[in-house]
């Protein structure tokens, strides 16, 4: 591309051009023929060319044709419609680095002499490091700068009585000639609803001599009204009398509309950071502050005089003041950009975190002129970050520790084992001891859950006091503990440790005046690190523990290979299940859910059943687990879904069908398509299908599973969270994903209405459902007193043997028909 001379390029006075060039965001102005009229230094750096090589050229001179075509189409749209265009895209900058830029293009009218032309103003914002909250803040900065630096203003003067003496030619934008605004004629262009307030403010300034700063609407030549801001100050004689008023009228319509749109958006979607304040400051060459924007003054409560010089430092939080002064004035001395986060004292009390960014500005001859900068309020982002870090820490701990005893869980054990594996020799022998508290359930039933919990804590304390610091103690389930010892020398040593643990635990307990005896059984497995993985060790120790349970309290069993017989039996079940699924030997039963206000059946939950030819009915908990282990859960789940949809089509249109989804089904990226195909093939309306998930779906590969859930919900399917309340994160997922229904786990219903704790939890869930507009369902209702309680608490639906157990499809249909006939008879 050859350098050319272009007479139509934009020129500015040196100070204004220096300020534009000091702005770190690229600014580009094109004429109606899409030629570059102006590029600031940042834009030249982005393109990687000198300004003199760009002025007068078009995108086609510096970009590939396809990319230039895209920009040309965008520019044509901006010029023809006048609508602002914003696009975010990756840009390769000189040096090969790729940055993400948000480019905003708008149309402006450029007047030079008696002629005017449309120009395209493009401003780019780098949002690479701060794409979240800071992106909104930076966008606000660019918009504010475009208003203050590029939009024309209308100057005016008035005599001490307030009569307008002269006004700039751009007053014609109101549809009135400038001469018509003289005297008090400006009022003709003003919106009637704003005129009274403006006249009062003007009269107040005339009476006191205080500056005028007022916003109002003026007529637009093309029709309607636009928002403007007028500011004015006085020139006084030596005796203090006012000689003349000097003011400007600034078009703030776009900014006003933007702020109003942002407020509305924030109220509607409760977004944050889109309308955060932007504070602008300018310094002279000596570092003394010459100007602070109105937003700075409003935030800090300072006046312009108080903020001048080094006075702005008085608004900095005392704990940050010395560091801020040192960093900023060092940057001034070195003429280097500055960026720092610190706290400002708020005018109304408290403090606000800001990120302050300053850039040196230079004259065309290289003379240092001072700094221009912005301060952005990032209080919400800082607070959210602190809360997020704290929540992450808590979640990390909760995910790896038992809430009751504070002991690590299986996940912690696995991570700790991996860490140890990097520091011990392959030949090092390890021992895993699985301990089961024999008779704990009887103690829990006899003395109550509180005593049982207290007993578990006492057992934990004894084990902690006995074990070595290098041992790892975990609680895997209600009454099962695991001990990992590294560096065991022999099987005899492992058995001795097991006996010592039994002796420690079986010593008598005194719990709140109650004497309690407890027995323990131990299953252990020992191997070198290179022989078995941790999961294999735990698995073999579990096998030994199951054998130990048959021997009663005090029994110790060490794993032997012959104990794998049970595993082989389980493998046979896997083969049998695969055969049953292929031959269609499985069945789907349907358990009713009833509306608690009308008593009407609204839903049937589809439940898989396996009538085994030899074993009889196989427990769903058993064969579902086998299906998940073998990968059969995918085809099994799809079969259940299709069977349920096929049957539900036959029911009345007000009756839905609920199907449970296994977390493993979400590993199939086509799950949403499977649901859609089942609905289309069977003809079932999507609103009559309810899919129930447990929160483990959201714990594993949360982002991917959430996306799948969103795709399913977009089909119109109802999504319910099952077993609500059994995990620590249930509440957080109500905020993460808009569930349609909550199903309260049966464990909270069993003790109703006697258990105050269960009643409090049930009441809280009902309140959450009402607040969020979510349907609330209770599982496991088997007694009338339970039903009366949940009705009183305001639940919507209930399920349980009080309403009916799982039924074959024909009986479910018969039940619906009988209900329908009863209802018809009652009418």
UniProtKB/Swiss-Prot annotation:
Domain PAS residue range list: 12-82, 265-335
Annotated PAC domain residues: 212-264, 338-390
Keywords of the record: Plasmid, Repeat
Domain GGDEF: 428-561
Residue span, EAL domain: 570-820
Superkingdom classification of source: Bacteria
Listed SMART domains: EAL, GGDEF, PAC, PAS
Protein's name according to its UniProt entry: Uncharacterized protein y4lL
Protein source organism: Sinorhizobium fredii (strain NBRC 101917 / NGR234)
């Amino acid at each position: 591309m050859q350098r050319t001379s272009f007479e139509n390029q934009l020129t500015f006075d040196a100070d204004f051009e220096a300020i534009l060039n000091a702005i770190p965001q690229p600014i580009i102005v094109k004429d109606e023929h899409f030629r570059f009229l102006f590029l600031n230094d940042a834009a030249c750096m982005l393109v990687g060319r000198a300004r003199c090589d760009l002025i007068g050229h078009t995108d086609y001179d510096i970009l590939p044709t396809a990319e230039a075509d895209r920009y040309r189409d965008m520019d044509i749209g901006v010029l023809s419609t006048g609508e602002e265009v914003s696009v975010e895209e990756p840009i390769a900058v000189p040096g090969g680095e790729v940055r993400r830029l948000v480019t905003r293009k708008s149309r402006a009218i450029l007047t030079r002499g008696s002629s005017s032309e449309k120009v395209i103003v493009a401003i780019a914002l780098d949002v690479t490091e701060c794409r979240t909250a800071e992106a909104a803040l930076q966008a606000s900065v660019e918009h504010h700068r475009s208003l203050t630096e590029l939009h024309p203003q209308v100057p005016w003067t008035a005599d001490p009585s307030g009569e307008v003496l002269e006004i700039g030619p751009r007053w014609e934008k109101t549809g009135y000639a400038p001469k018509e605004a003289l005297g008090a004629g400006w009022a003709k262009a003003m919106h009637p609803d704003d005129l009274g307030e403006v006249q009062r403010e003007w009269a107040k300034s005339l009476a006191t001599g205080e500056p005028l700063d007022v916003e109002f609407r003026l007529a637009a030549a093309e029709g309607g009204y636009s928002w403007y801001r007028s500011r004015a100050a006085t020139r006084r004689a030596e005796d203090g009398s006012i000689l003349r008023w000097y003011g400007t009228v600034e078009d703030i319509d776009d900014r006003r509309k933007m702020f109003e749109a942002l407020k509305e958006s924030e109220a509607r979607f409760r977004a944050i950071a889109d309308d955060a304040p932007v504070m602008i400051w300018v310094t002279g060459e000596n570092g003394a502050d010459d100007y602070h924007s109105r937003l700075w003054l409003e935030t800090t409560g300072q006046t312009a005089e108080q903020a001048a010089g080094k006075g702005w430092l008085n608004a900095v939080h005392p704990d940050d003041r010395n560091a801020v002064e040192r960093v900023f004035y060092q940057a001034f001395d070195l003429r280097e950009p500055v960026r720092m986060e610190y706290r400002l004292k708020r005018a109304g009390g408290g403090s606000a975190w800001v990120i302050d960014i300053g850039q040196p500005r230079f004259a065309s001859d290289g003379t240092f002129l001072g700094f221009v900068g912005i301060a952005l309020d990032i209080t919400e982002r800082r607070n959210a970050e602190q809360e997020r870090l704290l929540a992450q820490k808590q979640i990390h701990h909760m995910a790896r520790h038992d809430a009751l005893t504070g002991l690590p869980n299986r996940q912690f054990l696995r991570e700790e084992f991996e860490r140890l594996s990097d520091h011990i020799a392959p030949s090092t022998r390890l021992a895993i001891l699985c301990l089961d508290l024999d008779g704990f359930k009887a103690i829990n039933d006899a003395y109550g859950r509180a005593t049982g919990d207290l007993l578990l804590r006492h057992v934990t304390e004894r084990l902690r006091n006995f074990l070595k610091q290098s041992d790892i103690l975990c609680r895997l389930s209600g009454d099962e503990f695991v001990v990992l010892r590294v560096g065991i020398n022999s099987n005899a040593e492992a058995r001795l440790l097991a006996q010592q643990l039994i002796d420690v635990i079986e010593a008598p307990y005194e719990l709140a005046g109650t004497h309690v005896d407890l027995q323990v059984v131990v299953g252990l497995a020992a191997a070198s690190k290179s022989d078995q993985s941790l999961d294999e060790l735990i698995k073999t120790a579990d096998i030994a523990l199951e054998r130990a349970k048959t021997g009663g309290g005090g029994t110790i069993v060490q794993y032997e290979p012959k104990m794998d017989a049970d595993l082989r039996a389980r493998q046979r079940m896997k083969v049998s299940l695969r055969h049953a699924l292929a031959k269609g030997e499985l069945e789907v039963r349907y358990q009713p859910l009833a509306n608690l206000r009308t008593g009407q059946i609204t839903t049937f939950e589809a439940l898989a059943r396996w009538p085994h030819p030899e074993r009889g009915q196989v427990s769903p908990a058993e064969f579902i687990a086998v299906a998940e282990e073998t990968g059969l859960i995918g085809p099994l789940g799809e079969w259940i879904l299709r069977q349920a949809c096929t049957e539900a089509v036959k029911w009345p249109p007000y009756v839905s069908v609920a199907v449970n989804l296994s977390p493993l089904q979400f590993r199939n990226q086509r799950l949403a398509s499977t649901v859609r195909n089942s609905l289309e093939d069977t003809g079932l309306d999507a609103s009559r299908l309810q899919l129930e998930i447990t929160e483990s779906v959201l714990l594993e590969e949360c982002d991917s599973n959430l996306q799948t859930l969103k795709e399913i919900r977009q089909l119109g399917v109802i999504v319910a969270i099952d077993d609500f309340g059994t995990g620590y994160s249930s509440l957080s997922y109500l905020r993460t994903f808009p569930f349609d229904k909550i199903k309260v786990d049966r464990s909270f219903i069993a003790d109703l209405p006697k258990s105050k704790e269960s009643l409090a939890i049930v009441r809280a869930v009902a309140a959450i459902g009402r607040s969020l507009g979510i349907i609330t369902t209770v599982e496991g209702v088997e007694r009338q007193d339970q039903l009366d309680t949940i009705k009183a608490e305001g639940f919507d639906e209930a399920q349980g043997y009080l309403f009916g157990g799982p039924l074959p499809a024909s009986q479910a249909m018969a039940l619906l028909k009988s209900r329908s006939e009863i209802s018809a008879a009652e009418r």
